Every structure is written in structure tokens, then in C-alpha cells.
Amino acid sequence: TCMKRLYILFITAILLCTALSAQEADIRKVAERYKGINTFTATVIRTKHHAAVAEDAVTKGKFHFMQPNEAYMTFNEGKDMLIMDNGVFTMINDGQESIAKGVTHKQFEVLLIVLRNLLSSDSDSTDIKEVADMEITKQGNLCALTITPIIPDTKAKRRMMFTSFVLTIDIQSSEFKGLRMNEKGKNYTQYDFSD
């Protein structure tokens, strides 16, 4: 479901950028490029940045998306993976598997609620402002959508794995370029995609 959510996040960002950008025709090209895709494979570069470490850990891998509910990213010959399968988010680090539960799963659920609301024409849907703060910025040909889940419980907020998600789209080339998962402090994991 993580990859499905990434795909939905991507489509949402396109729709939001379409509404806010003067280059609506270019945004429509991005949406058209990915519309109706049943399978998608891309090269992905994962950059793990930790403020206390001098150098970032950079790893090349693959991103695979299969409709309707399966997607995964794999690195280090399968020792590191991020898997979304029918609403279950699994992370594998150095061969150790952990399934997102509790606060971490709730963060992904908030992200999914935001995305569903953006894509839904249902007027009874939950107000996005109740579950997340969103900000859209544009610099040159890049459009970035930042989604920050609203977690009112102070204890739960301290246990959050990610503080926000940033999706980047290249409007000129009509491509989904990256996803950044911001962590506490100045730490983050960046996924940069290419064909």
C-alpha cells in the first residue's frame, strides 16, 4: 500500500499543481503519462541523510508498481525493501522485516485519506484540513507537494517515523521525479526516480 499511496500521492500532486500552476497543459501531460498504468518499473536512487553523519548513504535500486494494490522498492539485492501489498506496509532493513503498525501506520493512513479526498468528488469526504497540512511550491520546472500529517496526540507525535512527505514532479518532462520522507530533526530519506 505504500507504493499505491506513492502512486496516489503522485496523481494528487499533479491535480494540485494543475489547479495552482499557470502551466496547466504541462501538468495534464504528466497526468496523461501515468493515467491507466497497470505496471510501472523505474530506477530509484535512495539517499539516507542523517545530520550527525558526514556522508549520505546512497543506494541504487528498482521501483515496481503493479495495479491494483502492489508496489515495492528494492535495494542491496533485496536486503532493503519498502513494500506495499493490499494496505500492509512492510520495511525490510538489512534483512530484518518490520510491518508498519500504530503511529507509523496511522501516518500512512493520514496520507491515504488526504489523497482520497483530493481525488474524490464526494462532498461527504473528510476535510483535508482535519488530517494534514499541505503546501505546494513551484521552482522552475519542478512542483513540490508537501503533506504534513496532523497528529494531535503529543505522545504519538513523538513516536512518528516521518514528519512530512514531499512529492516532486518535473512539469516540463511530465515525470514523477522523487519522494522525500522527512524524519525528525534534519534527517530524511529521499527517493529519486528515473526511467
Task: Place the predicted regions along the sequence by residue.
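Bacterial N-terminal signal peptides that target proteins for export
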Residues: T1-F10
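Bacterial N-terminal signal peptides
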Residues: L9-T18
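Boundary at the C-terminal end of the N-terminal hydrophobic targeting segment
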Residues: L20-E24
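Flexible, processing/modification-adjacent segments and terminal tails
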Residues: A25-T43, K48-H49, E55-D56, I92-D153, ...
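Low-complexity, intrinsically disordered segments exposed to solvent
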Residues: V58-K60
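An acidic-aromatic
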Residues: K62-I113, T189
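Gly/Pro-enriched, hydrophobic low-complexity segments
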Residues: T126-D195
